[in-house]
Amino acid sequence: MSLSPSSSPAPATSPPAMSLPPADSVPDTSSPPAPPLSPLPPPLSSPPPLPSPPPLSAPTASPPPLPVESPPSPPIESPPPPLLESPPPPPLESPSPPSPHVSAPSGSPPLPFLPAKPSPPPSSPPSETVPPGNTISPPPRSLPSESTPPVNTASPPPPSPPRRRSGPKPSFPPPINSSPPNPSPNTPSLPETSPPPKPPLSTTPFPSSSTPPPKKSPAAVTLPFFGPAGQLPDGTVAPPIGPVIEPKTSPAESISPGTPQPLVPKSLPVTTSYHRSSAGFLFGGVIVGALLLILLGLLFVFYRATRNRNNNSSSAHHQSKTPSKVQHHRGGNAGTNQAHVITMPPPIHAKYISSGGCDTKENNSVAKNISMPSGMFSYEELSKATGGFSEENLLGEGGFGYVHKGVLKNGTEVAVKQLKIGSYQGEREFQAEVDTISRVHHKHLVSLVGYCVNGDKRLLVYEFVPKDTLEFHLHENRGSVLEWEMRLRIAVGAAKGLAYLHEDCSPTIIHRDIKAANILLDSKFEAKVSDFGLAKFFSDTNSSFTHISTRVVGTFGYMAPEYASSGKVTDKSDVYSFGVVLLELITGRPSIFAKDSSTNQSLVDWARPLLTKAISGESFDFLVDSRLEKNYDTTQMANMAACAAACIRQSAWLRPRMSQVVRALEGEVALRKVEETGNSVTYSSSENPNDITPRYGTNKRRFDTGSSDGYTSEYGVNPSQSSSEHQQVNT
C-alpha cells in the first residue's frame, strides 16, 4: 500500500533529535544536503529517480508515493503542505534502518510536473511549527490513475538539484499507506506535529516534526475532484483550505490547522472579465442605439423628400391639366369656359363640311384624357378609319394637305389631316410641335387627338366638329343666315380661344392663320379655333400656292401689313387677322371680294372709312350685312365695330390685346375712344420664346414702313415677294 505524497512511513516513537540544514536554504527554498539521520527503519526500496519538478509547483505537490515494502512501525504522516515550493533532491537509493524520527516527505524526490495540468491541491496552510502529536497528511484532491512508489522516509535528503520554475503541477494519485496502523492516512494535508521543537526554515525534509515552509504558491489552482465540499476523493473530510503563507523569520510564526485561511481569490480575473464584458455590452448597446437613431433619421428625411417630390409633381401635373380654368379667369370669362383634357370623343354622326382651305373639325363632346403617347396612331389604323383616304370621306383640301373624315375602332369620329410631303420640318421638330399643341386644351380650341409618322408621311388627328366653319355659314350657305346673336357669340368664343393662345400658354402660341375657315362651329354654334401652331411645322416650305389657298404665311386678305412686308410675326399679327374676321361678321363680305369684273378689293380697305363714320355716331346701315335686316342690337354692333377698327390699325403697337377685345365684345370696356397702344412681342429664331421683349412700343413707324431691325420671326418665314400678292394686300 502506497503512502500519500504528503506522508512518509516512520515510527511514531522517533526522537526529536535531528540535524538542521544550513540556514542559507531559506531564501532560495532549496534544502542543502542533509546529514545522515539516525538509524532508520528497515530499508525500503528507494524510489526510482524522477526528474525534479520546477520549484514553483514543487511545494504544491507531495513527493511521489513509493511502495513501502515493510514498514516496521506505523507511519506518521507528515506531508509537506501543498502549494509549498521545495526543490526535491534527486532520488537516492540508500538503505537505512528505521528511524525513530519522522521525516517530511518533502525531502523525497518529487514527481515531474506537466505545465499544462493544474497543480496539486493548494489547500494546506503554511507548514510552520505545529503542536506535536497531531499528524495530518492531506492527500491530493485529485485521483490520477498513475501511482508512484512511496518515498523512503528513512533516507537522508541528498543535495538538492538546481532549482527550476515550473507551471502548475498536475494532480497525482494519493499514496496508499502500506502500514495498517497509520493513524490518519487520508486526513487533509495540514502541518503535522512532531517531537522536534524547532523545525527548520528550509523546505528540505528533516526528522523534525515541522514541515518545510512554503515559498511560492500558484495564483490559481484547478481542483479536478468535484466531490462534496470538504470531502476528499477517498471519502475523508478535508480541513478548510487556506492560502499558503511563507514563513519570513522564524518557525514560531505558525498557523493553527484549525484556523484556515481564505483561498486566493480565483474569481478576480473572472470578475475583471465580467466587468469588462459588461462595459463592452454597454458600449455596444450605445453604438447600436446611435446607429438605429441615425437610420431612422435618414429614413424620415428620405420619406419627407419623396413626399415633397410627389406633391410637387402632382401639383405640376394638376396645373398642366387645368390651365384654362385659371388662365381663363384672368381673361375675364371663367364663368363660361371650362378646362378641356384630350379625350376620345363619343361618336357623333353629324355632317362635316370644309371649305376654303385648311379644314378642321369640331366635336361638341371634347376628347378627354388622351395624352400624346396614347395618341400615336399607325398609318394602317388611320387608313382603315378613313376608308383608305377615299374621296367620299374627303372633307376638303387646303394648303397643308387633305382632310378626311374617319371613325376609329371605338366609334369616335375624327378629322385626319394628311400633310403634304415636303411641307414640314424634320421628324424631331414635328413631334416637338405636336407635343406642344397636344397640351393645349380650351373650350374654344379644337383639340389635337394624335398624330402619325410613317416614313415621309405626317398625319394629324383632330376631334371632329360637326357644324362646319364660319366661312361656310357666312359666305357659302346662302340658304340660311346667321342671326346677330349667333354672330356675336361666335366672335366672343373665337376671341377667348385666341386670347388663351396668346396670354395663357407658355410659350406663347401665335396662330398666324386666323380666318373664318379656321373657326369651326359645334352643335351649339360655339366657336372653336383650329389649326393653331401649324405654321411652325411648315416654315421651310418652298411650295408655291395660289393667292386663294391657305399657306403658312397666312391667307391674303387676313395678313397684317407688317407681316406681309417684313416677315415678322407677333401676337398683334393675329389681332389684325381677327379684326378681319369681325368685319366679315359685321358686313357678311369675304376678306377679298370683287370690286368689279376685273378688280378685287380688300375688305379692310373697303370697311376702314365706313368704320370711322359708324363709330363717330352715324348710321351702321351702309356697313352692316343687309341680310340681317337691321335685326341687331345697336350697342353691341357699335362695340364690335369699334373692336374691328382697333384690330385692323395699320400700326401693330396701336392694336389691342385679345383679352381687351374679349372684354370689349362683352361690353365691359369700350374701345371707341381709347387709343390702345398695347405691348407686342416678337421672337427671333435664336431667342427663347419665354424671353419676351417689347419691340413695337417705341417706334411705330417700324411696321408702317416695313423696315427690318435684323430680327426675324420665330418661324423664319419670309412672305411671298410676288407683286400680285402685295397688290392684293395693299389694295
Swiss-Prot record:
The keyword Cell membrane applies. It comes from the Eukaryota. Its main location: membrane. Residues 1-264, 310-341, 678-731 are annotated as: Disordered. Keywords: ATP-binding, Cell membrane, Kinase, Membrane, Nucleotide-binding, Phosphoprotein, Serine/threonine-protein kinase, Transferase, Transmembrane, Transmembrane helix. The chain crosses the membrane at residues 281-301. The active site is at 513 (proton acceptor). Residues 678-691, 718-731 have a biased composition (Polar residues). Mostly expressed in flower buds, and, to a lower extent, in inflorescence bolts, roots, seedlings, leaves and siliques. InterPro entries: Kinase-like_dom_sf, PERK1-13-like, Prot_kinase_dom, Protein_kinase_ATP_BS, Ser-Thr/Tyr_kinase_cat_dom, Ser/Thr_kinase_AS. It is found in: Cell membrane. The modification Phosphoserine is found at residue 549. It catalyses: L-seryl-[protein] + ATP = O-phospho-L-seryl-[protein] + ADP + H(+); L-threonyl-[protein] + ATP = O-phospho-L-threonyl-[protein] + ADP + H(+). Residues 302-731 are cytoplasmic. The modification Phosphotyrosine is found at residues 462, 563. Residues 389-671 form the Protein kinase domain. PROSITE patterns: PROTEIN_KINASE_ATP (PS00107), PROTEIN_KINASE_DOM (PS50011), PROTEIN_KINASE_ST (PS00108). Residues 30-100, 107-129, 170-202 have a biased composition (Pro residues). ATP binds at residues 395-403, 417. GO terms for molecular function: ATP binding; protein serine kinase activity; protein serine/threonine kinase activity. It is a single-pass membrane protein. Its EC number is 2.7.11.1. One of its GO terms (cellular component) is plasma membrane. Belongs to the protein kinase superfamily. Ser/Thr protein kinase family. This is Proline-rich receptor-like protein kinase PERK14. It comes from Arabidopsis thaliana (Mouse-ear cress).
